[in-house]
Amino acid sequence: MLKLKICGIKDEKNAKDLAFLNIDFFGLIFAKSPRRVSLEQARNLSAIFHEKDKKVVGVFVDENLEQILRCIKEAKLDGIQIYRTITKEEFEILKVQNVFVWQVISVENSLDLKSEIFANLVLFDAKGILKGGNGISFDWTLLGSYTKDFILAGGIGLDNVHKAVKTGAKILDLNSKLEDEKGLKDINKIKQILKELKK
């Protein structure tokens, strides 16, 4: 069953509207980004989503384990999505916290997989100027050689959501193509995506 994640939420009113939709995961960005949230914002947003039984994912880039663990505790995160490489030791510590770990692989011309990945799932995203939220896609045919479950991110919108589904991704991660302003998601665009996926 395909699941959806909307990433880069930072507005509480927006979050309350989104929480009513059939979306499984919501992403809060703790790394440097126009969509970055403070710990206080994260706590409030997380409470909104948990009230509707949604999963909350913290997005990190270079943050150390101590910072990540603090965010997990303070914002009651269900999982983390991280751009730097997670070590075996870090993965074991995170498992004790009862959170899932998504390792991001930034793709340009090849999948460029590390020999061993310590994560529950790999998230493939397009390599861009920013670490995520660039609104660009990579060549999804590259995923044909990957045999494990994965998450797909990068430039997914109404124009290519069916193509994204055909990659076999277990979770689609949507962000900038669903915005009117940085961090404000367009509810109507998301409803259109949900309608398309029912076809």
Curated annotation (Swiss-Prot):
The keyword Thylakoid does not apply. Pfam families: PRAI. It is an enzyme of class 5 (isomerase). Pathway: Amino-acid biosynthesis; L-tryptophan biosynthesis; L-tryptophan from chorismate: step 3/5. Its EC number is 5.3.1.24. GO terms for molecular function: phosphoribosylanthranilate isomerase activity. GO terms for biological process: L-tryptophan biosynthetic process. The keyword Amino-acid biosynthesis applies. Keywords: Amino-acid biosynthesis, Aromatic amino acid biosynthesis, Isomerase, Tryptophan biosynthesis. It catalyses: N-(5-phospho-beta-D-ribosyl)anthranilate = 1-(2-carboxyphenylamino)-1-deoxy-D-ribulose 5-phosphate. It comes from the Bacteria. Belongs to the TrpF family. This is N-(5'-phosphoribosyl)anthranilate isomerase. The lineage of its organism: Bacteria, Pseudomonadati, Campylobacterota, Epsilonproteobacteria, Campylobacterales.
